[in-house]
Amino acid sequence: LLDVLVNVRMTVIKLEGGGLWVHNPVAPTGELMSMLAPLVDEHGPVKHIVVGSAAIEHKIYSGPFSKKFPSADVWLPPKNWSFPVDVPLEQYVPYYPLGSPKTLPEDTASGVGAVPWQGEIEHSVLQVGGSSLRGFKDPWFVDTAFFHKKSKTMLVTDVVLHVSEDPPPVSAIDPEPLLVRGMERPDAMLPNTREARSMGWGKTVLFGLLFQPAAVDVKIDLANVNKSFLDGFTWDPSWRDGFANLCAKPLFVPPILQVLAFPRRRDEVKAWA
């Protein structure tokens, strides 16, 4: 709607007994499959496809990805409904070679629950809040922290972030979303330069984490709503300071979660952390 570019990432870990463990799979394009092929040749097949978040953008490709690796188990976090409307994942992605996905136990670090990889990778699931649409039964924010013991690497999806000053290199393939978002005022389209893409990246980050940054004035023309959502924005130069402040933090909790999610369950969040 806002032409905001949001990249998601996938992580692959080789298991000590052979095979691969995949975290938050992305679309199994030809390019991705060609990148995975050498890993499969060297370390063995994909054994586990693991999604740590309830957000649809992170689990939507678990079905298509598992179709490429039909012998792999698919794992999703518990109480895995999608905010704000609960639609079973099988209706979004009607193909899982081994049937319905398996459910991650809530915590392996404390010895509760068992998964095949727990000797190498520990995990703990965070479930926060409850939606009135579900009678406050199920959490609307779910994330999972995984800890790979050998490399001492932590994997999370949304709960902790680091923002780089430069946009991800993949965004240069189709720079239009960044160029549109980088405009300082309506109809002031930018040339495709590194500086312009960086401006678009900074504003994209602010939109993605804040929704309504203080440095932007939005004017919606009801006679031309679609165009307004693309370029009806006038930015104050102070956006640069806001973006720089985010980049200066080694790690931080997204402001949206700080305001909307975590205050509801402070004790649970502290215990999980």
Regions found by a protein language model. Name each.
Residues 23-26, 50-54, 76-78, 126, ...:
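Short His-Asn-centered micro-motif
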Residues 1-17:
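Zn-dependent metallo-beta-lactamase
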Residues 10-12, 22, 143-147:
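Conserved hydrophobic/aromatic beta-strand scaffold that supports enzyme active sites
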Residues 107-155, 159-166:
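Core dinuclear metal-dependent hydrolase active-site scaffold
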Residues 13, 27-32, 120:
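Active-site-proximal segments of catalytic enzyme domains
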Residues 39-116:
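Active-site HxH/HxHxD metal-binding segment of metal-dependent hydrolases
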Residues 27, 37-48, 56, 60-68, ...:
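Cap/insert and terminal regions of metallo-dependent hydrolase folds
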Residues 13, 53, 146, 158, ...:
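Divalent metal-coordination and catalytic microenvironments
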